[in-house]
Amino acid sequence: MEQITGSIKQGGWDAVCILGPTASGKTRFAVELARTLSAQWKPCEILSADSRQVYRGMDIGTGKDLAEYGEVPVHLVDIVDAGTKYNIFEYQRDFSKAYTNILERGCFPIICGGSGLYIEAATRGYELYEVLPDEELRACLEPKPMEELVQMLKELKAAKGEKPHNSTDWDTKKRVIRAIEIEMAQGEQREPLPLPQKVLFIGVDVDRDTRNARIDARLQARLEEGMVDEVKRLLESGIPAENLIYYGLEYKFLTQYIIGELSYDQMVKGLGTAIHQFAKRQMTWFRGMERKGVEIHWVKR
């Protein structure tokens, strides 16, 4: 920890990102780091990069142990209602607001999470754009021949100094029109969102057998804590079963159990296997980040 804190204090970083698969202990590590830096350097606050902890009322199933943070402020947890669909574009917008607020108060941001897409949206220095369908533009473009649409798309990209890089943009008229729609909408966007440009990535990892054992023990503990009752309450509040199933993992399997699609034993076994596979996919994502040039400093916990 001393080597890490020294690097942070001397490195001129915009933020630190603590990432890792589920059950790796990354939250505990992030809190320890925040407390150490707050005592030695400047106040630190945590920005969650978890795609499901944003939802209110989804606590046990997402491992949202707010007590673990203690006195350390945490952002981007409990910000939208369960049953809604919060997307990556909204997350990047909300992250930027929270990140800017932390900096304005003279604090240091520590990003913590295991959702690779959210981590990249927050730290890779590019802004995502949610481009809604423009029916008026589509009606105008549809009668045009394919050759004219392709040329229009090439000119739009050239005006931004870009070269066509995705051959699938050109294979159907529908794809070309959608690509034009996106290019034109992006050209009208506001100034880029403030996002951290220089980020120190620290990965928290455990060996596979230990990780899987932790996952199984944690699953049993959460079931004993009332995870089934939590999902029942969400269903009783009026959230459709399919909306909870959409969230995957705990909420998918427990909902299927409650509505009679799975037995209890099938639910427990299937959920345990699914979480093991999920952790493996998380590690695959992080290795992919490394292949793209992101330097992740791995620590064992």
Residue ranges and their predicted role:
Residues 1-301:
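Phosphate/pyrophosphate-binding catalytic cores of soluble transferases and nucleic-acid-acting enzymes
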